[in-house]
Amino acid sequence: ALLALPGMAGALLDEAQRSGRYARLAEIFHASRNFLYLGRGMHYAIAREGALKLKEIAYIHAEGYPAGEMKHGPIALIDEEWPTVVVAPQDRVYDKMVSQVEQIKARRGKVLAVASEGDAYLAGAADYVLPIPAANEFILPILAVLPLQLFAYEIARRKGLDVDQPRNLAKSVTVE
């Protein structure tokens, strides 16, 4: 599975460039002021990375939150003005993530789903799908982070920001 990773990542990046999907999403979401990112299990860290990337290079407030804890706070924020990005590839926690998407949609929230290619259910349930190749569950988090980084990158570009030199960010952390 690990040997196939570079090819899968390359194909994902090629498809993203060919389709123009992320530039179109940036056009839709560049003026959004807040985002909620949800992930469960291994994908919680990926959701946090996606939120962090959006903050760092697009200067948009974003929170990465464990999907299982959504009812303990973030659910109160969900509406049509606060988009939610869910990391929901087909793996052992998929059904629980589908339930989260349904709860968000019941509150008229906009959902962008990082989902496995060919996932017909999320293609219909989410407002937008960021597809990743089907893969071994231990490879999925590596693939799932790519759409989130592309999304942040395109939003920053759409806003005219320098993605190579984000403001107030150091390339290293110094311990005193």
Where are the model-predicted features located?
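Glycine-rich, anion-gripping cofactor-binding loops and their flanking helix/strand elements
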Residues: E69-K105, A135-Q149, R157
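Short alpha-helices
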Residues: A4, A125-E176
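Glycine-rich phosphate-binding loops that contact phosphosugars or nucleotide phosphates
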Residues: A4, R40, V87-I132, F151, ...
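Active-site phosphate/pyrophosphate-binding segments
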Residues: A1-P83, A156-E176
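Feature representing long, continuous alpha-helical segments
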Residues: G7, A45-R48, L52, W82, ...
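Short, surface-exposed linear patches
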Residues: I57-H61, V85-V86, A106-K110, A134-N136, ...
